[in-house]
């Protein structure tokens, strides 16, 4: 505890010194960080300096220097985010733990559209199914944000913005090869023809990999679990006239993988086939002082498990319709508001339980007012009313004042509520409970973002989150077990980030994140952040070795964790202590010509032997290399 206080005190001291000298520093050009424009935090384009929340951006430039990596690998190096299973087999589920919250409490968006899987137990989407090659940038919004985005935005929002056509029509080819017989090929086409933009990407990935399950002591190696992924992305835009544009998108994905029976348990004939289609159409109407947006999307997922002839078929379908208005009343007041409708349905068949046919709907309306003054004071006030076809109505709010000094020092406070609705499985399956209420959360957050010079940035944020009606598996009635609202979860922590550019050719970003949490059940109160470290820190270093050669060094320390797994021999749940580990990766890129880029990525340089999930393996020292060729 003393160490935590000393960290905060030191950062506040630096902030005080910076503010005392703000008049001198205000004459310098502000760093790009606060001037960067994002859309996720307010549902309309705003500079980060105007937003009283923690926003982080993975830019197109960063992704361009991550060729051959995966989306989970890139997200894992953001302060306060741990991707469970990041170092495991690609077929393993990747769990997004933001600020210590469960994976279901982080909302994933693609181009602003909520991405869920109605066929899964808790409804979250596996981000390993999203190829990094279709992504232009990623905006990460931390804290409770259900007022703007509805269910699941309890710990934060990750908005994956896909590539759109710009410039002259051109093609590109990417190919990689690496450890574990891993290969990937990408063919892309992008550009603009008069008033029409188009982006088309086709991706094929294959890997023989290694056994997901770790062999128990005294057992020989298990068989390899392969992974195969095929994906297609199509984005089309049409500028109809000076005020109105339309867009359409199609993302099709198929994953085929070999699975194991569980922790320390192999399976020779267990396969998984996941296919998904996300299609949408939308439009933007420019008004005199704002914009009117509409989006209609359809998200269909099919999951098929075949375990030695025993077949499970689960399908999930989500229809989502949304209309948003952004309006500028004046230089001081902006309005964001909208209405949305979502229908979820699932059909599930397996040999072990009754067939499941279920659906429900969620309707909501929200509004958010943004105020700014010439003195630097800014505030956002918002609310959302939600109506669920099963449990009824609930309300969320946001109160978010901030203050901007000298265009480069930002202080903020954020008080908000958020919620997560129970999934179709939790409501209607053999273990379902129609009396379930949504999980409801209240969050408090405060911090600062200080740009001392154009080469130095320091940020600190503290958060506290209280979730009631936590959905758990327990006894509903005599001799009946299922899902029930019975727990209360309390989490808190802080994050520190320091960005430096000591030389024009060197960029450094260091971070430290701390989180702790306890759950209160009818029996006791205990720490329960399974698979999530209390402490994590890292350093990302970018070095331009020459005009054509760049080097990125990526280091992350993941602290001690605890885990639980089911022991198939004793038929009991076992708790395991997972030790801390350090990961060091190196990525080097050579721009051979204006159109040809060569790259190599070496991961786990220290060949660290570590565990992310008890009973499962992770990768040792591994690499991939490849090229990207542009064709006009």
Regions of interest found by a model, annotated:
Residues 36, 71-74, 94-97, 109, ...:
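N-terminal periplasmic accessory domains that precede
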Residues 373-375, 464, 485-566, 594, ...:
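Gram-negative outer-membrane beta-barrel transporters
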Residues 114-142:
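Short acidic/polar hinge/loop motifs at secondary-structure boundaries
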Residues 241, 330-336, 340, 344-467, ...:
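Structural signature of Gram-negative outer-membrane beta-barrels, strongest in the C-terminal barrel
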Residues 265-282, 286, 404, 409-410, ...:
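Outer-membrane beta-barrel signature, preferentially recognizing the C-terminal barrel domain
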